[in-house]
């Protein structure tokens, strides 16, 4: 896991400066139903540990290998809408207030979607994450 690069307040300021009022998490119907039944948004690792039903992802093995299987990813926009197409993560979209970041124990912002180039996660964290708040502005 990467180190702490910025505070939650710094991230909130950047989100607000860019008019990002909501964060988005898309998933399959099966996984989304587990979130609803168990009243929470869980990482894939946590879902597995608790025995909650979820849809397998083609990236699971690589995510485990590179230590991101316990991470939860959000988008800063509605990818369904932006791409004018179905979201590759699934048809169910959860929309959260940007204030959800205050509930996170750790925040890291990736330079690009980790689904692309997952085999390169052996590179150093500076190549995968924004490492200072100024890079986000």
Regions picked out by a protein language model, each given a short descriptive name:
Residues 1-137:
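Active-site-proximal loop/hinge segments that shape catalytic or ion-binding/gating pockets
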């Amino acid at each position: 896991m990467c180190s702490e690069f910025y505070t939650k307040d710094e991230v909130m300021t950047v989100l607000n400066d860019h008019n990002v009022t909501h964060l988005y998490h898309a998933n399959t119907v099966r996984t989304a139903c587990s979130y609803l039944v168990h009243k929470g948004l869980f990482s894939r690792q946590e879902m597995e540990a608790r025995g909650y039903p979820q849809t397998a992802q083609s990236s699971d093995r690589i995510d485990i290998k590179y230590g991101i299987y316990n991470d939860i990813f959000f988008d800063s926009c509605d990818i369904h809408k932006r791409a004018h197409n179905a979201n590759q993560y699934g048809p169910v979209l959860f929309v959260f207030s940007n204030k959800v970041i205050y509930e996170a124990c750790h925040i890291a912002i990736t330079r690009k979607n980790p689904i692309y180039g997952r085999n390169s996660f052996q590179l150093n964290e500076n190549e995968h994450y924004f490492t200072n708040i100024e890079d986000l502005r």
